[in-house]
């Protein structure tokens, strides 16, 4: 009798967990809500008052695309935010971001508090398989606390996590979705695929395609292949 009860509880718990996962992971359901990245910036910006924004700066070209993206949507993203969390993994990226913020703040009043978080790189280009696995595990462990702090600050506020970069974005998304599933702390994750991806997604893009709440491509030719994606033209 006791064994039967235990099995019933286990089956019930697993069923509830699977239902919860299906409700949280976007690939299992279709959202009819308007996406945050749209040409109607004024309308969307009004719906995102007191926004808590989290962006991650990948290195090199990823950082350049992210800076152009937030400049293009600065009214909706920066000027609507009360807190901006900036994740980065190299010093050059954060210097470029601070310079861009300074340029924007000269002509606009930014009331947001900016908080910087240094993440380890998930992997270095050219590293071996063993080295990559070790680096990914280390980054995942260290990212757990950082993402929880960011997630906690989003509680009670409209929030947006904007990603466009390397493998670290996968780790960030993993933790944010895990907290959503088990701690009931939702977050809106938007991934913008690189402009360089004209025919197929990057490896990060393929991993995040089923996980991101909104997946944005910058070439219309990708839409028939990835029907869940959204296209707003060239954003960067």
UniProtKB/Swiss-Prot annotation:
Mark the transmembrane ranges.
8-28
Keywords attached to this entry: Endoplasmic reticulum, Membrane, Nucleus, Transmembrane, Transmembrane helix
Q: Where in the cell is it found?
A: Endoplasmic reticulum membrane; Nucleus membrane
Domain of life from the UniProt record: Eukaryota
Output the InterPro entries linked to this UniProt entry.
Oligosacch_biosynth_Alg14
What are the GO cellular component annotations?
nuclear membrane; UDP-N-acetylglucosamine transferase complex
A GO molecular function assigned to this protein is: N-acetylglucosaminyldiphosphodolichol N-acetylglucosaminyltransferase activity
Q: Name one Pfam family in it.
A: Alg14
Segments on the Lumenal face = 1-7
Topology relative to the membrane: Single-pass membrane protein
Q: Which residues form a coiled coil?
A: none
Which is a GO BP term held by this UniProt record?
dolichol-linked oligosaccharide biosynthetic process
Which stretches are Cytoplasmic in the membrane topology? 29-236
Q: Which family does it belong to?
A: Belongs to the ALG14 family.
Q: What does this protein do?
A: Involved in protein N-glycosylation. Essential for the second step of the dolichol-linked oligosaccharide pathway. Anchors the catalytic subunit ALG13 to the ER.
Quaternary structure note: Heterodimer with ALG13 to form a functional enzyme.
| Protein's name in the database | UDP-N-acetylglucosamine transferase subunit ALG14
Quote the gene name from the UniProt entry: ALG14
């Amino acid at each position: 009798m006791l064994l039967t009860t235990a099995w019933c509880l286990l089956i019930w718990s697993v069923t509830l967990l699977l239902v919860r996962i299906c409700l949280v992971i976007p690939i299992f359901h279709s959202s009819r809500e308007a996406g945050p990245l749209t040409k109607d910036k004024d309308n969307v910006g009004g719906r995102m008052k007191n926004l808590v924004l989290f962006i991650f700066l990948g290195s090199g070209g990823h950082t350049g695309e992210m800076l152009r993206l937030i400049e293009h949507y600065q009214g909706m993203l920066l000027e609507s935010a009360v807190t901006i969390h900036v994740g980065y993994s190299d010093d050059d990226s954060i210097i470029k971001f601070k310079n861009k913020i300074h340029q924007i703040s000269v002509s606009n009043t930014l009331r947001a508090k900016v908080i910087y978080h240094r993440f380890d790189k998930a992997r270095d280009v050219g590293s071996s398989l063993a080295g990559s696995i070790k680096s990914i595990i280390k980054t995942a462990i260290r990212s757990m606390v950082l993402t929880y702090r960011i997630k906690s600050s989003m509680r009670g506020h409209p929030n947006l996590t904007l990603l466009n970069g390397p493998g670290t974005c996968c780790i960030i998304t993993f933790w944010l979705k895990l907290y959503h599933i088990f701690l009931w702390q939702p977050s809106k994750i938007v991934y913008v695929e690189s402009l360089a991806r004209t025919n197929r997604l990057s490896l990060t893009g393929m991993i995040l395609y089923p996980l991101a709440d909104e997946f944005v491509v910058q070439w219309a030719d990708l839409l028939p292949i990835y029907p869940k994606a959204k296209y707003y033209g060239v954003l960067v």
